[in-house]
Amino acid sequence: MNIVSSIALAVAFILLGVNRIINIKKNTEALYEAVRFISSVKNNIRYLSMDYVSLVENAENENYSYITFHPEITISDCVGEKVKGEFLQFVQKIGTTDEDGQLNFCDEYIERFKGFYNESASKEKSKVNVIGAISVLCVMCALVLGG
């Protein structure tokens, strides 16, 4: 293997590692944003007695990065199917009960998403370290084989 191909391979390993680390961080950020969204919905129901249409209009103005509102309210695919399904269940149930029921429902989903977030945040550091170490090891192997 010549030096040019080994450098190209090393750069590819670096880019793969960086891409994976960015995806892990996006997952954690999206989960945090979901908790923020659900908390905002709860506060708007509790203090402003907003209906579904008002909740959506207000949420659209809050500048979420991982939550979209058109054609329907969804969360980014970076969170995985299980979390995305839970988020869609929450969105579908907003406005289906009285105010107390909605507040209890919001509390339940806030706790669920805090659990998802805490799990993701606790694993994030170790995953990032492992992926970084593997990327460095692959880069070193590529350079040794090419040199």
Residues covered by each model-derived region:
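Juxtamembrane/interface alpha-helical elements of multi-pass membrane proteins
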Residues: M1-H70
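Bilayer-spanning, highly hydrophobic alpha-helical transmembrane segments
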Residues: I7-L16, A121-G147
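Non-transmembrane, amphipathic alpha-helical segments
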Residues: I22, K26-E29, E33, V79, ...
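Context-gated lysine
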Residues: K25-K26, K42, K82-K84, K93, ...
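Generic structural concept
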Residues: V35-I38, K42, E60, L88, ...
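Amphipathic alpha-helical interface surfaces
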Residues: Y52-L55, V83, Q102, Y109
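Short, non-transmembrane cytosolic segments of multipass membrane proteins
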Residues: P71-D100
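Membrane-interface, cytosolic juxtamembrane amphipathic helix immediately N-terminal to a transmembrane helix
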Residues: T96-C138
